[in-house]
Amino acid sequence: MTTFDDRENAFENKFAHDAEMQFKAEARRNKLLGLWAAELLGKTGDEAAAYAVEVVKSDFEEAGDEDVYRKVSGDLGDKADEITIRTKMRELLVEAKAQIMSEIK
């Protein structure tokens, strides 16, 4: 194997790792978002956990975050506006990445 082959394999492995980490972070963010929204909806315990799973599943409808936003926004109605939800999504993505990194160490 040449140095170029080694380098190519390293780049492919890094790309796959980064994609996996991003997927895990977004799934974790969606779960945290679901738990946050469930609290606003007055759900607790198993009902809140089930709602969080619904939010995670909503992300598989299309690429990007719009499907998750639509789900949460539609469910919350006037309990949270667009800016609040989108800001919470960004905050929770940072939190999710930090949680995942702390689990790796």
Where do the PLM segments sit?
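A charge-rich, low-complexity, intrinsically flexible signal that marks solvent-exposed coils, linkers
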Residues: 1-105
